Amino acid sequence: MVDMMILEIIKSEGLAHKSYFIGSKGEAAVIDPRRDCDSYVNYSKKHEMQITHIFETHCNEDYVIGSMELSKRVGAPIYHSKNLDFNYGNIVEEGNKFQIGDIELEIIETPGHTRESISLLLKDKAVSDDAYIIFTGDTLFAGEVGRTDIYGDDVREEMAGKLYDSLHKKIIPLGDHVLVFPAHGSGSVCGKDIRESEFTTIGYEKKTNPMLQKSKEEFIEHKLNEKMVKAPYFKKMEVYNKDGAPLLCRLPYLKPLGITEFKEHIGTSQVVDVRMAASFAGGHVSGTLNIWKRGLTYFAGWMLNYEDPIIVIDENNQSIDEIARYLIRIGYDNIYGYLAGGFTLWANSGEKIEKIDTWSVHDLKERQSDESLFIIDVREIGEREEGYIEGSHHIYVGDLKDHLKEVPDDKYIVVYCDTGNRASIAASVLKTNGYKEVANVLGSIRAWKAAGYPLVKD
């Protein structure tokens, strides 16, 4: 049995989510577990520790919390805030303390991102009675703070004020030395400008985090003007995480489908090609949606429903287990199978192949003023406000399906984003909806800037 304190960080790629396994003297706690919970069980075996506590920092909106799944496997109780009417687990409140070996965890209520947000303050009593770690959930990140728009505009000012108070009255006074372990890293939808860092400190954030430099009035004003999109699947996650998600017990089995069986399912299934943009453009099965693999953990929630079976097309099917994990983390248990042999099998079988044109930024620059083109910027509005290609029209990729009437069917459609990945999603949506001439600008804004071409602002 290990005597010293153990802290393991479990990262969920794509979601940029971080959960934590902490333990001491044969006992362990898990904070904000993901749904595929084998990592925590494996760590408990590795360190010879029994998981005795499971904590949730808030009701997450971007992924399915794995607390019930983990509790089912290890028998540990679940704890979350009293300030939301959860239909499972046990409630905690400000000042509650829990002993895990020599570790003491104290609950600090830190509302703002959500009303029920809590942070967990850690002391290693074998070393000192002073706290030196705080798990901040979605309250404080490296270089950023949590978003405050989850409940809508009516209470946005109120939530921004609560977040400011949580930061300045609860967290910052703990001291510059305290290590901060947040629930997300760079790339998460839960904060706009999160810096990639394994951890940070309160002192470092005081010096470098722009959101901690603002007065309360400036902070609230910034939050009121912050523009971030809310994916439709968030509502599903909130229901699952409040009421309890269905138990999986194991990863879904994805059935390998031969060409004949695959073709039988095309009309009744959601077929997703998870290859990168250039590969998809070079050849794909007609009618399929392209979401690159790492993008599944967010954009599947915009593009796929939770009822119809999902079938996956990959390059060589080396990542099927990983793809299944990505999808179940946001509640897609309706995964049915995959094309055995990948797209290569389809191509080698003499089946029809659909293509999407690819343009370089130089191609677009050369034809930028061509009136036969309809150029679409599919980035978020906040990105567009920082600069866009002159003559382009803005339709966010997640909204494109509902705004196809705005896209003329008698013009050549050119799509761009920041790198070409989201543009490939958009191009596949357009193709499946009957648009014949569609091009994806590979490299998109990043390449446009690198080439020295100008952007405009409103």
Role assignments for model-derived ranges:
Residues V2-Q50, L120-G137:
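Conserved beta-strand hairpin/beta-sheet module of binuclear metal-dependent hydrolase folds
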Residues V30-I31, I51-N60, Y79-K82, E109-G112, ...:
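Active-site neighborhood of phospho(di)ester-bond hydrolases with catalytic His/Asp-centered motifs
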Residues I22, D32, H58, L70, ...:
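Divalent metal-coordination and catalytic microenvironments
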Residues C37-Y79:
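Active-site metal-binding motif and surrounding structural segment of the metallo-beta-lactamase
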Residues V127-S128, I133, G143, V155, ...:
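Divalent-metal (often Zn2+) His-rich catalytic cores of metallo-beta-lactamase-fold enzymes
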Residues R250-E261:
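A contiguous, basic/glycine-rich beta-loop/short-helix subdomain that forms a polymer-engagement track
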Residues P33-R34, C59, T114, I133, ...:
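Active-site metal-binding loops of divalent metal-dependent hydrolases
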Residues R147, Y204-K236, A245, R250, ...:
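Rhodanese-like catalytic fold shared by cysteine-dependent sulfurtransferases
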